[in-house]
């Protein structure tokens, strides 16, 4: 078998993840580090691996990720979307399974910008009646 690789791009908040799936034994590397070294807790790792678990391909692919920007939760969400999109490239039969579990939907929520005259996005100065 030749060098087959499936690529996917995921975004979440301000994080961008470039995911590459290669047929293999199931190892995952994030910025050349293992997930339990890169992420502080296991819940984030479980969230990131969901597309592989749902499609039952956890042991079929090696996952190589380059992720930049944002925090750990945003990065995990970006990786999750990238893995789901790469799985679609590998096998389009996964579309229905991933679509039902909302793995293919890009989460549009992002930080709201600060407005002038306010202390934050919505926090306003204290109101004085007199």
UniProtKB/Swiss-Prot annotation:
Q: Name the UniProt key words of this record, in alphabetical order.
A: Ribonucleoprotein, Ribosomal protein
Report the superkingdom from the record.
Bacteria
Please give the family membership noted in the entry: Belongs to the universal ribosomal protein uS9 family.
HAMAP family, alphabetized: Ribosomal_uS9_B
One Gene Ontology biological process: translation
Region labeled Disordered — which residues? 109-130
What PROSITE patterns is this protein classified in?
RIBOSOMAL_S9
One GO molecular function term?
RNA binding
Give me the Gene Ontology terms describing cellular component: cytosolic small ribosomal subunit
Q: Which residues form a coiled coil?
A: none
What name has this protein been given in UniProt? Answer: Small ribosomal subunit protein uS9
């Amino acid at each position: 078998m030749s060098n087959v690789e499936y690529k996917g791009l995921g975004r979440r908040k301000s994080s961008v993840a470039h995911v590459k799936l290669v047929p293999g034994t199931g190892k995952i590397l994030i910025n050349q580090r293992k997930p339990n070294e890169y992420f502080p807790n296991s819940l984030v790792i479980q969230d990131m691996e969901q597309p592989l678990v749902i499609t039952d391909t956890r042991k079929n692919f090696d996952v190589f990720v380059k992720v930049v920007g944002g925090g750990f939760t945003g990065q995990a969400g970006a990786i999750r979307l990238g893995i789901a999109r790469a799985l679609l490239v590998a096998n389009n039969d996964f579309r229905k399974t991933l679509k039902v579990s909302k793995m293919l939907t890009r989460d549009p929520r992002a930080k709201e910008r600060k407005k002038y005259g306010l202390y934050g996005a919505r926090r306003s100065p204290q109101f004085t009646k007199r």
